[in-house]
Amino acid sequence: MLIGVPLETAAGETRVAVTPETVKKLKAQGHVLRVQSGAGVAASATDEAYVAAGAEIVDRAAALGADLVLKVRAPLADELSLMKPGGVLVGMLNPFDRDGLQRLAGAKLTAFALEAAPRTTRAALIVPAAVISIGNRRWYLSAAIITAL
């Protein structure tokens, strides 16, 4: 799967959705990773570290145009316009923001809101879960899905 990691654009945001260590793990599973140039700088991860881990360094449009886009924060309207209809978005999407949800629905994405996913062992047993690493934390993705058809 083609996975994109864009630079976070929210003021003061210093996190990145995928570290070079995570790139190695995803690459070992056969995924192709495209990281926007400078995406990890605020989190002390250089473009060179991403390349050494197996990622391609790309521009904003290429990172946002991937099949699966991993972000820390919800995308801005101009970022949504660069995302692939039918693609998947994973991140902290602020599911209580009605306007944001309307924009997501309009973009025709399947979106996983990490802050809405259960973090209990029991929930992980009930609903199949995948683990995504954001920085040094592990978040569980499950049925907290916003799907726009």
Question: Where are the model-predicted features located?
Answer:
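Glycine/serine-rich phosphate-binding loop and adjoining beta1-alpha1 elements at the start
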Residues: 2, 77, 81-144
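Short internal beta-strands
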Residues: 4, 25-42
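Redox-cofactor binding/interface segments in oxidoreductases and associated redox assembly factors
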Residues: 5, 70-71, 90-91
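Glycine- and acidic-residue-enriched helix-capping/strand-helix junction motifs
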Residues: 11-20
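N-terminal beta-loop-helix "entrance" segment that forms/cooperates
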Residues: 34-56
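Short acidic low-complexity segments
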Residues: 54-65
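Alpha-helix boundary/capping motif
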Residues: 146-148
